[in-house]
Amino acid sequence: MEKEKSLAKNIIIFAIGSFSSKLLQFLLIPFYTRVLTNSEYGTIDILQNIATLLIPIISLTISEAVFRFAMEESSDKEEILSIGILSSIVNIIIMSFIAIIIYQVTKYEYIVILVLYMATNIIRTIFSQFTRAIGKVKVYTFDNVLNVFITIVANILLLTVLHKGVTGYLLGYVIGNTVSIVVLLIAVKLYQKIRIKKFNAKTFRNMTKFSIPLIPNSICWWITNFTDRVMITTSYGTSINGIYAVAHKVPTIVTVIVEVFFQAWQISANKEFEKKEISKFYTDIFHYLFAFVFIICTVLMCMCKLITNIVVGSEFLEAWYYMPILLLGTAFFSMAQYLGSIYTASKNTKMAFVTNASVAILNIFLNIICLKYIGPIGAAIATAICYLILWLYRAIDTRKMVEICYDFKSIIVTVLLLIVNTIIITMEIKLWYLYSIILLALIVFINRKRIISFTRLAIGMIKEKIKIRGEA
């Protein structure tokens, strides 16, 4: 019970930061879809996806190693942070020289801002991960909110006052990241912890031994997550990709919730992995997460058309059509991601890569076929299928490390009901909203035991917190 309470406490802290920051971003969707054209939004989406691909390669995913190694009680925290920052600075300098050469050849207008976007992102991520690893979760949470707030204010000024378009949008992120870096340097006194003499070659090798296998893993994630957008842009242009990118905003609500969970879960998983009762811990948390994710995805499917009409600009109204299938894929992805945490906790990053690589190859193949014969929505279907296969693959493979006792009956029935709900809404079958509500009720009923159990745990924590404050 103590493990669950610790996890729940961390979830609450991370939720305050992530929900408030992501809510601000979500509320700005009407603004972005009105001041940016379909083409500009599509270009921004492609540039951010390019950055997502390149950042792990440039940084050697060292931020993951910083978090994992700094979590260990016996580790030299200053040494780990120094290695992470110094190695990243060297890599950023190399990247800048390469970017200069590329610019001289191509004269592509967005190269400079893209380099700044990636450089500030790399440094901020290392500082942020280190702050979380050493237990400064409140500072970590505050910084997340501040980062988003500054980014949004900068974006509003750059897009509406200065009319900088794509460059202004990305520059807003650069400004937000820079402010965040300065805040963490001061608040956690990171400037006192970074020392050149602390760079230890042996520790660096151990850290890169952990992080480098995550590079191809990240590339595979990129292929699985973003191949659809690249292929849509190639086949149908940036305008359709802009609509598809907006469609991803509703599934992002689920992603944010799951991200909050994983920020807390990584801490618990890394601490508890070697203990005997780990199997029951993983089993309980899996079923809590499963019930929650599938219920919230069903609710959002029912509301996707309403949300689209309220939130997005008139040029993007078609986005709702893609949302149910994207939500289905997000549900599968969330469960695959949970099982992927077992690889990180056990430091078995090789199998994380193998599972991702297999599905990434399949995703390319399916995207080519589905886009050709079904159209843009085929990309969403291909991605959902790949996430389902990744979940099943990992469910089988991770049993060698942690034996999770799955409630197969409730899982299979819930998955089938969500698939039926997706089909009903996408095809706009008559009275689809009524059928969707009935399916939601069935999913809640099937998972009622997990919901009740989790609710009791949450209420118990709240009562305990009130009691402690009363005694104080």
How should each PLM-predicted stretch be described?
Residues M1-K3, V112, V166, L170-G172, ...:
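Interhelical loop/hinge segments that connect adjacent transmembrane helices in multipass membrane
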Residues M1-L24, F67, S75, A201-N217, ...:
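N-terminal membrane topogenesis motif
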Residues E4-S63, I92, S96, N147-I152, ...:
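Signature of the first transmembrane helix
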Residues N10-Q25, N147, G172-V188, A201-N270, ...:
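Transmembrane helical elements of multi-pass membrane transporters/channels
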Residues F19, P56-I58, S82-I113, V182, ...:
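Alpha-helical transmembrane segments of multi-pass membrane transport and lipid-handling proteins
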Residues Q25, I58-S74, P251-H287, G340-A345:
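Helix-loop junctions and terminal segments of transmembrane helices
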Residues D143-L190, S358-L362, P376-D397:
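Hydrophobic alpha-helical transmembrane segments
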Residues I404, I423-A472:
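Membrane-proximal transmembrane or re-entrant/amphipathic helices at the cytosolic face
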